[in-house]
Amino acid sequence: MADLKDFAEQLVNLTVKEVNELADILKEEYGIEPAAAAVAVAGGGAAGGEEAEEQTEFDVILTAPGGSKLAVVKLVKELTGLGLKDAKALVDEAPKPVKEGVAKDEAEALKAQLEEAGAEVELK
């Protein structure tokens, strides 16, 4: 198992030149067309980074109501349009999403408002 981990680490750390050499060896000596595999290995890390940077929708998660629970319940009621009973239940059952799939600017504004009211909030 340790050998496979070492191999995987070496494979991930290959330079572009080394990946191309590996592709040539696989094609010439073993008849394997590694084009798709080479793209996956070379582009795998970059794709994950780009995806994180391009996130456009966020979930606003209430992790804890904080010290001023009443103010947080009122604000959640106002922000979500829920009734008082439902807003209180949402706050009591934290961590819970307050809003899901909102734009970054709106998510940050909601987070700021909730934190101002004393709540602990995170964006996902």
Swiss-Prot record:
GO terms for molecular function: mRNA binding; structural constituent of ribosome. SUPFAM superfamilies: ClpS-like, Ribosomal protein L7/12, oligomerisation (N-terminal) domain. The keyword Ribonucleoprotein applies. Pfam families: Ribosomal_L12, Ribosomal_L12_N. One of its GO terms (biological process) is translation. InterPro entries: Ribosomal_bL12, Ribosomal_bL12_C, Ribosomal_bL12_C/ClpS-like, Ribosomal_bL12_oligo, Ribosomal_bL12_oligo_N_sf. Keywords: Ribonucleoprotein, Ribosomal protein. One of its GO terms (cellular component) is cytosolic large ribosomal subunit. Homodimer. Part of the ribosomal stalk of the 50S ribosomal subunit. Forms a multimeric L10(L12)X complex, where L10 forms an elongated spine to which 2 to 4 L12 dimers bind in a sequential fashion. Binds GTP-bound translation factors. Belongs to the bacterial ribosomal protein bL12 family. Forms part of the ribosomal stalk which helps the ribosome interact with GTP-bound translation factors. Is thus essential for accurate translation. This is Large ribosomal subunit protein bL12.
